Structure formats: structure tokens, C-alpha cells
Amino acid sequence: MSILFHAYPLARPALFAMDAETAHEVTLAQLQRAYDCGLTRKLLHAQPEAPATLMGLSLRNPVGLAAGLDKNGAHIDALGNLGFGFVEVGTVTPRAQPGNPKPRMFRLPRANALINRLGFNNQGLDAFIANVQRSQWRSQGGILGLNIGKNADTPIERAAEDYLISLAGVYPHADYVTVNISSPNTKNLRALQGGDELSALLGQLQERRLALADQHQRHVPLAVKIAPDLSDDQIDAIAEILPRHGIDGVIATNTTLARDAVQGLPHAEEAGGVSGAPVHELSLRVIERLRSRLGDAVAIIGVGGILSGRQASEKMAAGAQAVQLYTGLIYRGPALVGECVRALAQGSR
């Protein structure tokens, strides 16, 4: 355990000298090698006991991996064994697509932030499912979330078709499914967060889920991932719609388009969504508002800007039942997982 944890701070300067997306790929490849050699196998069992329940699912601990880090589900076991209680991979679209032109990911180290405009780059649903089927994570008791989106060339008016295709494909292989309607990097996608559009989409997804549950004889929870840039009225409308359509969870939040916290920094004006530290307070506002409107009707997963155990605890105090990490891992490395688990275990005593 100590070898891996000490290795990342030593490797970080070299990784940060690379293009951000290249460094991301190198890190995943090295992590996979470490897992294949057995160097990460003990990390999963080194965390303190912090059992939690989320959307009816039993978690080892309430600290998860956010979608986006492993878009194709190729590294589920290696990532899960860093000590996560649950892992979410994707976003996957029905057909493979390259995403936006490179460069499309930028670090802002002074703000502990990233800007990305990746655009749902992925190998498509068939390759994604094949990767998921090869994973041992679920058979070892890990919880797996599969995150679905729409192809860039699918008109927004036909977005539901893409989500329905992907839901049917991933349903047998998921512990829960996340409907991503909040990436700022797919044209018009965030329009699906609007009241009428959201209600229409979720109505179709719930109908399909009921049929899939009957076909596979199991209920798979559905979550919706939303943006941090919503007004109070928009949050209230979403909070009214989710339980009406039987949605089990809401992930708050995705990246922000706001630039206030990074103004004047190199790359600050690059197009795309900001993740990392600047999102923490924005997501707290959304979580608090959702919890006040939802009560206990829908589970909330808090994500955005968690770079310490204290910030994970703040997400829970705001009303989340679980948290997810992504950008914090890039700045802090795998030690962040255990720090967050310990903080939440201590807070639950």
C-alpha cells in the first residue's frame, strides 16, 4: 500500500509535464500494471469499516469513483481496488465516437482544477459491455454504476432513443445506471434538464426499465446526473420530477461553465467544463437545495471538488448519502480515497 501511495507524489511532476489527456492515459496504464502485479489488491481491504446503503445497494463504504475517469470500463478492477465502495464508468454512447478535437483537457494547478471538453469520447456500447463483462469487481462484492449518454450526431429531439438503447444494453451488467444529461460538451444536452424535456425522457426510461426488470427479474436503480449551474427554480423542478418517475438517485454535480474561480489563470478561457476545487461550493448549494425539496425520497450522491476528507464530510453534511471522486485523484493521488473513507467512517460514529 505504501509503495503505491508514495509513488504518485513522486510521479506527479513528470505526469504534469505531459499533456493532461496523455498523462491520464499513462496513469491508467500504470495503475493497471500495478493491479495485474498484485500491488493494489490489499488496498481494498485496508480501509476502515464504513458500510452504507445507497439506492437500496449495500456499499463497503460511501466513497465512489465518478464517471469519466474510465470511459470504456477497461480498468474497473484496478480502480475499484484502490479502496472505493463503488465504481461508476462511462459515459458510454450507443455508437463509438472520437469526441472533440485535441487538445481537450487542461490543468489549472493553482486552482486545483481541470477544464475538459472531451465530448463523450468512447468505443461504443458493444465494446463497453465486453469490458464490463470481463471485470471481476461485481463478483467480488463491488458495486458498479454504468453511465449512459447520447451520441453527438443524434438530434436532441431523438436523444431518448440513444438512452433507451444504452439502458437496455447495460441493464443486465449494472448495479445502477446513471443518465448523464449534464455534460456541457455535447451540444444542447443540458436542455434535457428542463422540466418538460426531463419529464418526457424519464417517463420513457422508466417504462423501459419496468420492462427490463420483468425480463431480467431484477430491479436496477436509475440515477440522473445534473449540472451545478442550475437556478433554484430549475433545481426545484428537477426535485419534483425525479420521484414522480421513480428515479432512485441524483448525482450532484457535473462540471461547471462558470469561470469566476479560475479567472486570469492559464487555460481559464478554454471551452469546456471546469472540475475540481471550484465546483465544491457550487455542488454543495445544489445538494442542500435538493435535500430540502426531496426529503428522503431520492438518494443524493455528492461529487465535485472533493480534495480532502473534510470536503467529503461537507458533502454528506449537506445531504448526500455517498460521494464520488475524480479531479481530486489527479491532484492528490490514490491516498485521497482512504482519507475520505476514514473521514466518513469517523463522522458516522
From Swiss-Prot:
The lineage of its organism: Bacteria, Pseudomonadati, Pseudomonadota, Betaproteobacteria, Burkholderiales. PANTHER family: DIHYDROOROTATE DEHYDROGENASE (QUINONE), MITOCHONDRIAL, DIHYDROOROTATE DEHYDROGENASE (QUINONE), MITOCHONDRIAL-RELATED. SUPFAM superfamilies: FMN-linked oxidoreductases (SSF51395). This is Dihydroorotate dehydrogenase (quinone). It is found in: Cell membrane. Pathway: Pyrimidine metabolism; UMP biosynthesis via de novo pathway; orotate from (S)-dihydroorotate (quinone route): step 1/1. The keyword Cell inner membrane does not apply. FMN binds at residues 67-71, 91, 147, 180, 225, 253, 276, 305, 326-327. Its main location: membrane. One of its GO terms (cellular component) is cytoplasm. Belongs to the dihydroorotate dehydrogenase family. Type 2 subfamily. Its EC number is 1.3.5.2. The gene is pyrD. HAMAP family: DHO_dh_type2.
